[in-house]
Amino acid sequence: MMNYATIVTILLLLLSGQSVNSQESPPELTPVTPIAIEQGYLEGRGLTRVDPSEFDGENVTRDEDFTSDSYTHAFYTGKIFVAVYEAGPGRVYIDGALYDEFVHILEGRLILTPDSGDAVEFKQGESLVVPQGYKGYWYMPEKYRELIVINTDYAKAEGGP
């Protein structure tokens, strides 16, 4: 005859969806390891040229005088996207940023002029957050490089990874 503790254990296992006599081994756990942010990329070495069409559909319009190439290196893509981005002088208009973006300026200056206010300048070594929905100009008056962290929830909402 089973005792009360055995009956309760069996009921709990049944309610949790596990087999009482399960011979299944536990699922394999994928090891989680840190990802190094390599200094060379932060300094602009080894970056890959960006195809300008990658910005299609991101509510970004380049000014006609923005002809310089852009370069990048992605460190990580998951719930966040972490990358270095570099461009020459230029200005773009953002008509409603699709995602929250953390920016740390590695080289150059960034001048943001929101539709709703005055220009704000950020310099090398400074950090900022551009919230989802931002509308305004993004101006890089000289060679510019940044470390960015982007929330990738927007891509999932649009059927992305």
What is the role of each PLM region?
Residues 22-79:
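A short, N-terminal "cap"/entry segment at the start of jelly-roll beta-barrel domains
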Residues 132-156:
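Ligand-binding loop in jelly-roll beta-barrel domains
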Residues 7-16:
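Bacterial N-terminal signal peptides
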Residues 1-6:
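Positively charged n-region of N-terminal signal peptides that target proteins for export
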Residues 97-112:
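Short, conserved beta-strand element in jelly-roll/cupin
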Residues 82, 94, 112, 146-149:
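Short hydrophobic/aromatic-rich beta-strand segments that constitute the beta-sheet cores
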Residues 117-132:
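Short acidic-glycine-tyrosine-enriched beta hairpin
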Residues 78-97, 132:
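Conserved short histidine dyad/triad with adjacent acidic residue
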